Curated annotation (Swiss-Prot):
Entry superkingdom: Bacteria
UniProt name for this protein: Ferrochelatase
Taxonomic placement: Bacteria, Pseudomonadati, Pseudomonadota, Betaproteobacteria, Burkholderiales
Root EC class: lyase
Protein species of origin: Burkholderia pseudomallei (strain K96243)
Gene this protein is translated from: hemH
Role, per record: Catalyzes the ferrous insertion into protoporphyrin IX.
GO molecular function, one term: metal ion binding
Subcellular location: Cytoplasm
The keyword Translocase appears for this protein: no
Amino acid sequence: MSFDSVPRHALSMRFDLEPPSHASAAHRVAVLLVNLGTPDAPTPRAVRRYLAQFLSDPRVVEIPQLVWQVILRTLILPLRGRASAKKYAAVWLPEGSPLRVYTERQVESVKPLFAANGYRVIVDYAMRYGTPSIADVLAQLKRAGAERVLLLPMYPQYSSSTTATAFDAAFAALGRMRNQPEVRTVRHYADHPAYIHALAEQVRQYWAAHGRPAFDAGDKLVLSFHGVPKRTLDLGDPYHDQCQQTAALLMSALGLTTFECRVTFQSRFGKAEWLQPYTAPTLKELGAAGVRRADVFCPGFTADCLETIEEIGIEVRDEFVHGGGKEFHRIPCLNASPAWIAALGEIAAENLQGWPVRVAMAPEAVS
């Protein structure tokens, strides 16, 4: 074959260094939970570094990069870095960032569940932005003998700006590997019965401990999903429809109607129109309309983070109270609740079918 027929980029391609392949090596299966990411510390420098990576993703901000990078580097990072660091510091746990802490707990909780059901798999997690990166963890899994990897995003509803970009990062890492593992992806589980059950259980258990809203007296449950620009809906992103689907199934599981329950979208960034109604203005309007109690739950967030603890628990609460509301409740996210861990195991097991993950005898503890 003549090199003239080989694409120029292929001639200059460089692959990551890898150890020699051995036929006798362990052929293991891995489940990789993928979440968004978090700064390494609640400091302006760490937050700016994280935001620079996050907001430089063209799937997150769909503006020509040459223009956007000037805006990002000269205006947004200098201003938002310090302000965001203060917010992170307010929610930081002794063990670290809430998102990382709860994600690690999910991993440690699902491992024994797999083992108890006869699965011998490696379970780990990675972050799309920050550490541990998807590329680094995939490399670690390969060194541990993983030849098959299930990518399980912690985003129940698919969106280009979350699920797709996580897959982009994974495939980019694979593109640098000479010896690639087999990979499967979980696109979404917005309507999965186990996920809906876990959501309903989380709400029920919170109400059992803190009292159920007096819906007959006008109290409300607000289901707040992370927002995205409205134009993404017009361009074919299924996120909005899947959020509505999740909300409808959860309301049905709780026996609620659209009178008792509202669906909203939070975390708007910039001046463009995002999916509506917006969470904070809705809570302010409810308070002004005489709603005494409002409970807010975030079904699209599988682990508590800045957007749920600080934005909902502080900023949105203040909007409701200033509007005239009396009692505000933020229902914690799924985190490592037993029902959610069981759901994670079920969703993963369905997508592991056909791979050699079961053992005939009592399994060893998973790595």
